[in-house]
Amino acid sequence: MKQLVTFEVQDGENEYRDYGIYDHKYSDEEIIKHFYGLDNIDEENGWYWKDTSIVRINNAEDIDRDKIKIMKDYGVAYEHNI
């Protein structure tokens, strides 16, 4: 089973969320590096620096194939393989 990962991003006063679908076997750091295309990231109190923004995994919950299809159909989240 895969997991729906919710990223929380803070960029100055702006806050937003991104979504991705990953296998359970990856760490938060690996997922963040892959999703944002980063080679090296610095961690501070559970947040990771991405240029001038900070990002963390806010939530990760199991998702089944039917829900994955719905997320893809609506362009909300896609499956990622590291």
State what each model feature region is.
Residues 2-15:
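Short aromatic-glycine-(Arg/Gly/Cys) micro-motifs in beta-strand/loop hairpins
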Residues 5, 26, 51-52:
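Intrinsically disordered, low-complexity segments enriched in Ser/Pro/Gly/Ala and basic residues
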Residues 15-26:
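A short, exposed loop/beta-hairpin motif centered on an aromatic-Gly-Thr core
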Residues 28-29, 64:
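A broad, structure-centric signal for solvent-exposed, well-ordered loop/edge residues
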Residues 31-36:
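Short amphipathic, charge-patterned alpha-helical segments
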Residues 38-82:
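Short, mixed-charge low-complexity intrinsically disordered segments
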